[in-house]
Amino acid sequence: MKNVINFYYNLYPENIFQTMRGYYFFIGKWRYFFVQYLDDIDEVKKIYDRHLYLLNNNIYVHHIIVNKDGNVLTFIDGKYYVLMLTVYYDKKISFDDVAFFSSKIIFSDMVINNGSIWALKNDSLEYQVNMLGYNYPLMRESFSYFLAFGETAIQLFNSIEKNAFLSFSHKRVEYLEDSYDFYNPFNILIDYRVRDVVEYLKSKFFSGLDIFDDMVNYFNKNNLSYDEYLIFLARMLYPTYYFDLIEEIIKGKKKDDDLSELIN
């Protein structure tokens, strides 16, 4: 891998280390991550331009390093890789980190239709559970209960006029997530500004911790519109945590018994 980094990036680290995420190395005080890119290739330019916008507006994300050909992706042994320069990578994020990141408003006429996205996810999971549920007793017994929360969230979201601000958000935000994932530009998207805060609070709540003070502080510091409060509630109702775990179980990455802590 040293030869790859030397040739494509004109960087000459003394050592390269491999982890579950990919590879990393140091040059001086700077830490670089060389990781596989698994998402849609057509989205790469949009992600790169978005990360430049964030950096130019003093919002920290890991800096994407282009290769000698000026490309974000480097094709090695049949796989695409990206190189990122990181400053923050092993610190656990706090609620204040999440709230600050999502406080940067984007003025756009972009339409975010969470209702349709959630409905498609519900239908897909319901079909898979009906087909495979006999292998997973806890999944089979609990799915209808959480599906009802999902349907209620969809109905509420679809009834809202969406007088709400957009901001940069994340595909997923979890309590005690490390800063490597949080500031990874490939994890960032655009959504309503309450998205990250809600997902963080749900994750913290299901870790057995109180979230009341965080919610009160957030509401006091942010002038949410009426519609934003409703979107906040709809996202709170939608059981992201449960559906994510169901998908992991179906893929064989988790076990049916892992549901017990969530549903008992």
Task: Describe each region flagged by the PLM.
Residues 14, 38-41, 113-169, 213-217, ...:
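ATP-dependent phospho-/nucleotidyl transfer catalytic cores
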Residues 154-197:
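Active-site acidic catalytic loop and adjacent metal/ATP-binding pocket
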Residues 123-127, 242-264:
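ATP/Mg2+ or Mg2+-diphosphate-binding catalytic cores
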Residues 28-110:
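ATP-binding pocket architecture of kinase catalytic cores
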Residues 39-41, 89-91, 175-177, 186-187, ...:
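Short acidic, S/G/P-rich loop/turn micro-motifs used as interaction or catalytic elements
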Residues 223-254:
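C-terminal structured domain segments
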Residues 2-29:
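ATP-binding glycine-rich phosphate-binding loop
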Residues 179-224:
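Active-site Asp-x-Gly
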